C-alpha cells in the first residue's frame, strides 16, 4: 500500500529528523509530567548524546513517568498484556511478546518496562496496584550480564517491604478554612 511504500522510502537523514521530532515530543511530555532530570536522545532508550547532553533519566523521574502513564487505562491494558498480535496496513501479521516477566512473578503488577544498555546496566520500572495502594518501583544499574534476574529479586524485596510497612493514613479530616485579613498584604 502507499503507507508501507512511504516508510520503505524514508532516507537515513529523514529518519534522523523523525527521531529528533519524536524525542523532542518525549522531552516535552516528560517535563509536563513533572520530570526534571530527564533528557531523551533516542526513542528506544539506547545510549546516545546530542548537543543538549546524554540520554539520561533518574529513578525518581522514571517513577514520575510511570505514575503519569498508569492514569491511562489503555496504557495499563497494553503494558500488562503478555503478548499481542496485529496486522499492518498490507495485512501482514506480527506478534510481539512483552519482556516484562515480572507480570507473572508478582501479583497485582499492572505495568512495567525493562531496559538494558552497556552504560546503564539492567533497569526496570513497574507499577503495583491493589484495592488500597499503588506503588512504583524504579531500579537503575540493577546488575550487568550474568545478573539479569537481580531486577526481579530487588523489585520483589521493595514491593514486599512497601506492602508490609505502608498504610494509607488520613492526616487531616474535616478541614475548615478561614478568611484572614492581612495588613499591607497584596493579592
Where are the language model's segments positioned?
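Domain-terminus/edge residues, biased toward the C-terminal soluble/receptor-binding domains
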Residues: 35-36, 53-187
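Mid-domain, small-residue-enriched loop/turn segments at the edges of structured enzyme/sensor domains
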Residues: 1-67
Amino acid at each position: 500500500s502507499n503507507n508501507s511504500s512511504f516508510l520503505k522510502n524514508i532516507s537515513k537523514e529523514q529518519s534522523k529528523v523523525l527521531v529528533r521530532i519524536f524525542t523532542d515530543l518525549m522531552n516535552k511530555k516528560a517535563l509536563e509530567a513533572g520530570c526534571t532530570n530527564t533528557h531523551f536522545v533516542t526513542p528506544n532508550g539506547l545510549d546516545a548524546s546530542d548537543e543538549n547532553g546524554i540520554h539520561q533519566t533518574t529513578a525518581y523521574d522514571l517513577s514520575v513517568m510511570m505514575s503519569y502513564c498508569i492514569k491511562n487505562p489503555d496504557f495499563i491494558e497494553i503494558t500488562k498484556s503478555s503478548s499481542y498480535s496485529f496486522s499492518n496496513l498490507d495485512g501482514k501479521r506480527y506478534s510481539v511478546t512483552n519482556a516484562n516477566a515480572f507480570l507473572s512473578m508478582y501479583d497485582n503488577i499492572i505495568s512495567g518496562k525493562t531496559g538494558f544498555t552497556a552504560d546503564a546496566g539492567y533497569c526496570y520500572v513497574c507499577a503495583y496496584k491493589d484495592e488500597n495502594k499503588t506503588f512504583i518501583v524504579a531500579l537503575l544499574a540493577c546488575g550487568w550480564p550474568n545478573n539479569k534476574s537481580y531486577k526481579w529479586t530487588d523489585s520483589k524485596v521493595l514491593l514486599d517491604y512497601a506492602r508490609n510497612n505502608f498504610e494509607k493514613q488520613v492526616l487531616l479530616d474535616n478541614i475548615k478554612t478561614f478568611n484572614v485579613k492581612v495588613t499591607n498584604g497584596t493579592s
